[in-house]
Amino acid sequence: MKSSDEKKVLFVSGRFPFPLHKGDQLVLFNNIRLVSQKYKVTLITFYDNESELENLHKIKKYCEKVVLIKRFAIFSYINIIFSLFRLEPMQVSYYRSGLFKKKLNLLLSVDRFDLIHVYMLRMAHYVKDIPTPKVIGLIDSMHLNMSRRVLNETGLKKAIFKYEEWLLKSYENNCTEWFDRSIVVSKIDKEYINNHNVKVIPVGV
């Protein structure tokens, strides 16, 4: 049984953890499950469609509170257009939401969290200026992933991906400075980011 003075951890995610189809969803779910054994957990996350919420009970089992914000694809694509003027990676702009920021700020105003755990680079900007101790699960280097994709593309698509790669390089390195610790799953990703606060924790550990 959890005590009333137990420490609180806030998880911030761009993707609902169920169904467990992708690696980052599995990492998020396992971390919530493990952290909930000793701490009170709150999750704030986007979801894309109602079918995902059929599994809501599976995550509520481990969370004191779950805050859900629906992500509408049309607004995400509009954000990508504006990213050209912000010099911001498209993958970051895709997940920008005034409603998400509002809900997050409300959570932070009514609860005192001892740690904020953000999942993926695309969500980092939401907590950039929050003084609470912060950890980001980068999972892997998005800059490295994009550089690999560039090699397999041609024409206009290659040019777009090359531009995104350039933006991600700067953004990813700056992002790690906003957090007390950044986590990746392999040494290759750590070396590519090359920041002193990056720690390697393989999947399943």
Model-derived regions: residue spans:
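Short N-terminal targeting/anchoring amphipathic segment
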Residues: L104-M123, P133-V135
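A conserved catalytic-core segment of Leloir-type glycosyltransferases
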Residues: F46-N105
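N-terminal subdomain of nucleotide-sugar transferases
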Residues: M1-L68, D111
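Short, charged/polar "capping" segments at the starts of alpha-helices
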Residues: N49-L56, Y126, K190-I193
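A short beta-strand/loop micro-motif in the catalytic core of glycosyltransferases
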Residues: I116-H117, E177-S186
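Acceptor-binding helix/loop patch of EC 2.4 sugar-transfer enzymes
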Residues: G14, Y77-Y94, V135-S170
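Carbohydrate-associated surface elements
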Residues: I188, G204
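Membrane-proximal helix-turn-helix segments that form the acceptor-binding/catalytic region
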Residues: N31, K102-L106, M142, K158-R181
